[in-house]
């Protein structure tokens, strides 16, 4: 296992509460951001947070007081996360962007200090061909503080997984959108995490976890010449306790599931 071994067992709240999990993971993000010596008054972009405040909490921990653009295509989620950002980071300037990734470039600066995205690829796979009606169908449950997947989400994944050609086309679109984002915004840093979601690890959605992880590896291969070495990232992740829990020790704290890009 990766991470720091402990005799202490994992807190039950981490397995049942989104807010508890967000707080735990925000510490990891804060360490990664601190180790990259990013400007506290810089220009950041967060991609597809949903209603999760992990990144906002991490930015608070590093005393961030710059500008951040939040790209979230699901309008209800954007309103909720905007309220959280304004509460957590009252001194930051927050720009909400209610667009899909490929449609947001005109709303963003031509150069940014850092692009951050926590666990975006599974949702991007699910909603790539989407519209507001699909977002409502798939993600209306994200505001609840309970780890469960709704039936509409599962059914949509089943439909996608039965159409391999369509799924491969979606994967190519996702990769191209990230590469276009880098081209259009010239980020100093790009940071993405994509480990298996505990809530997706049962039933047919377990394959969505694997699909999203594979997609991260493909994106890393496109950017390999500008990536921070995994052993450096691993040293940072190893500072955190794994509680002898498989998801933490083998996935969340495993550098293979993190992409840290630095502009050459």
Model-derived segments and spans:
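Class I S-adenosyl-L-methionine
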Residues: 201-264
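Conserved SAM/SAH-binding beta-strand->alpha-helix loop
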Residues: 74-76
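Short beta-strand element of Class I
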Residues: 65-71
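Conserved class I S-adenosyl-L-methionine
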Residues: 40-51
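Class I SAM-dependent methyltransferase Rossmann-like catalytic core
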Residues: 1-39
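S-adenosyl-L-methionine
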Residues: 82-107
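A short SAM/SAH-binding and catalytic strip from SAM-dependent methyltransferases
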Residues: 112-169
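Conserved SAM-binding loop of SAM-dependent methyltransferases across substrates and taxa
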Residues: 51-65
């Amino acid at each position: 296992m990766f991470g720091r071994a402990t005799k202490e067992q994992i807190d039950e709240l981490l397995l049942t509460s989104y807010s508890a999990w967000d707080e735990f993971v925000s510490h990891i993000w804060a360490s990664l951001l601190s180790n990259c010596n990013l400007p506290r008054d810089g220009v950041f972009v967060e991609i597809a947070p949903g209603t999760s405040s992990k990144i906002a909490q991490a930015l608070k921990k590093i005393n961030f007081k710059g500008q951040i653009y939040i790209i979230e295509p699901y309008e209800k989620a954007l309103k909720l996360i905007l309220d959280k950002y304004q509460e957590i980071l009252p001194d930051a300037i927050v720009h909400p962007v209610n667009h899909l990734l490929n449609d947001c470039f005109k709303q963003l600066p031509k150069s940014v200090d850092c692009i951050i995205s926590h666990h975006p690829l599974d949702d991007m796979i699910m909603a790539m061909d989407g519209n507001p009606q699909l977002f409502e169908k798939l993600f209306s449950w994200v505001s609840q503080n309970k780890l469960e997947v709704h039936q509409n989400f599962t059914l949509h994944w089943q439909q996608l997984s039965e159409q391999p050609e369509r799924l491969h086309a979606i994967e190519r679109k996702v990769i191209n959108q990230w590469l276009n984002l880098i081209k259009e915004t010239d980020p100093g840093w790009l940071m993405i995490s994509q480990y298996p979601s505990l809530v997706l690890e049962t039933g047919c959605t377990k394959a969505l976890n694997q699909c999203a992880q594979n997609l991260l590896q493909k994106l890393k291969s496109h950017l390999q010449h500008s990536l921070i070495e995994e052993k450096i990232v691993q040293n940072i992740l190893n500072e955190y306790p794994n509680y002898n829990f498989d998801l933490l020790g083998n996935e969340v704290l495993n550098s293979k599931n993190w992409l840290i890009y630095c502009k050459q």
